[in-house]
Amino acid sequence: MNTEQFVIAYDVEQDRLRAILPDGFVSLRPVLRINAEIQNGDNGYIEFNTAVEKDGIKGWLNIGYWNGVPFERKGKTVTFRTDFLDISFTGVGIKGACPAEKDNSGCYFIEDTIRLRKPEIISSDKEFCDCEFRWTLSENNAHGKSIGKTLPAVPTEITNIYPKEEFTVINAAEIPCNQVLGAYVVRFER
């Protein structure tokens, strides 16, 4: 399957992430990630994840995913627009790599059981992007815009203990974006 994968990572308050994670998962970094894909040129797909560790295995925890997502191309910009998220990526022509790939054993999906999907081996170059996003599930949702460079997601010590909340897309989308850490697109055959 021909795949264009657009990825954005953004910094959030790590204590807010800790408050929504299911039991058994530990937050690795104060980051939320949106993966938006165009599959075979006509199907849009989005995943929403956060970096975690479970039983000594580091990876991503899927918060939600959607298939059949509408998208539009205008020049170098690709926009995914739904009733819950507006996100656009514009390639800037600079190639690079993603630092989060170094400790990624896959992506956990919580279904009837917890399933770990192994990471894909992608050797294609990544093209950095300018990116802007806005969750639209409620008026308090996260939004942000990239600043033209890639920044690290630095783990933080616990400073605030928040009441436990349900692990849902709505609760994760309400955690404010402090800063977009980076965005890229990679094209590959799946």
Model-derived features: positions:
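Structured soluble/peripheral alpha/beta segments that form catalytic or ligand/cofactor-binding pockets
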Residues: M1-R16, I20-F128
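Interaction-surface and assembly-scaffold signal
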Residues: K74-R190
